[in-house]
């Protein structure tokens, strides 16, 4: 993965690199490869993630339909 450094602006190049790595899922993969995960633990984690996604989707849909109040925004 390459990032162009313009005008010796290393901070901006690092931000761009981190954003690219985040989009590609490199941080998640590094965390997963840090230690072995048993297949049963992997299934349990994936199931929990699926449940979390389903709840989030249902909550967003209920907010759109007006059944739940929306997020409170700081003024």
Curated annotation (Swiss-Prot):
<keyword id="KW-0689">Ribosomal protein</keyword>
<dbReference type="Pfam" id="PF01165">
    <property type="entry name" value="Ribosomal_S21"/>
</dbReference>
<dbReference type="InterPro" id="IPR001911">
    <property type="entry name" value="Ribosomal_bS21"/>
</dbReference>
<dbReference type="GO" id="GO:0003735">
    <property type="term" value="F:structural constituent of ribosome"/>
</dbReference>
<dbReference type="GO" id="GO:0006412">
    <property type="term" value="P:translation"/>
</dbReference>
<protein>
    <recommendedName>
        <fullName>Small ribosomal subunit protein bS21B</fullName>
    </recommendedName>
</protein>
<feature type="region of interest" description="Disordered">
    <location>
        <begin position="33"/>
        <end position="75"/>
    </location>
</feature>
<dbReference type="GO" id="GO:0005840">
    <property type="term" value="C:ribosome"/>
</dbReference>
<feature type="compositionally biased region" description="Basic and acidic residues">
    <location>
        <begin position="33"/>
        <end position="52"/>
    </location>
</feature>
<keyword id="KW-0687">Ribonucleoprotein</keyword>
<dbReference type="GO" id="GO:1990904">
    <property type="term" value="C:ribonucleoprotein complex"/>
</dbReference>
<comment type="similarity">
    <text>Belongs to the bacterial ribosomal protein bS21 family.</text>
</comment>
<dbReference type="InterPro" id="IPR038380">
    <property type="entry name" value="Ribosomal_bS21_sf"/>
</dbReference>
